[in-house]
Amino acid sequence: MQTNRVILLAVMICLVSAITVFLLNGCKVDFLDIGGTIIGCFLGIFVVVRIQKKQS
């Protein structure tokens, strides 16, 4: 898969995860949960891109 496509897919997953956390909190903004979700997703992007570059 191309790097841009992987990043786009990961960003979509990140947004869905953040929205899900927001809804599970009863539509209350908890910045630690949402921030943790976003940071975790972007760390996942970083790992996937590094693995993909090693395989190329």
Curated annotation (Swiss-Prot):
Where do the TM regions start and end?
6-26, 29-49
Q: Name one GO cellular component term.
A: plasma membrane
Could you tell me the superkingdom of the organism this chain comes from? Answer: Bacteria
State where the protein is found: Cell membrane
Q: How does it sit in the membrane?
A: Multi-pass membrane protein
Which keywords does UniProt give here? Cell membrane, Membrane, Transmembrane, Transmembrane helix
In Swiss-Prot or TrEMBL terms, this protein is called Uncharacterized membrane protein YyzG
* Organism per entry: Bacillus subtilis (strain 168)
